[in-house]
């Protein structure tokens, strides 16, 4: 009897605005993505910024998140903190310019929440200084293609 190979589960699948990259990392439609693997979720003139599922998978078990302070101001491409895992440390690069209006304090005691749900556990919320900067970021499809080239 000839065996037919089974494709990997969910490879390239799309459901309810969520797609899965070849690395099995989740990518969400409607968000903006940077080449340094941060995402931006915009709500009016404010935005949530965190690391992508691809980033948390690459880092492994996250043990510490160095977050900015409320009222800190960042330009796009400025470092705003760092994420440390058992495998590596990675600088966080702000994909947008703005003023920090909130940080996710839960990550101080439970940095591993990012491993459980990277998109649900943002790092900082900013008041955007220049929404036109979003045009230089990737949409979900472009980010998937970017991750596929990196992998």
Model-derived segments and spans:
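Acidic, low-complexity mobile loops and tails
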Residues: 20-79, 116-151
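Residue-level recognition of beta-strand microenvironments
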Residues: 40-42, 86, 103
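Periplasm/extracytoplasmic soluble domains of Gram-negative envelope assemblies
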Residues: 85-88, 96, 128
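Short, charge-rich, low-complexity interaction segments located
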Residues: 100-116
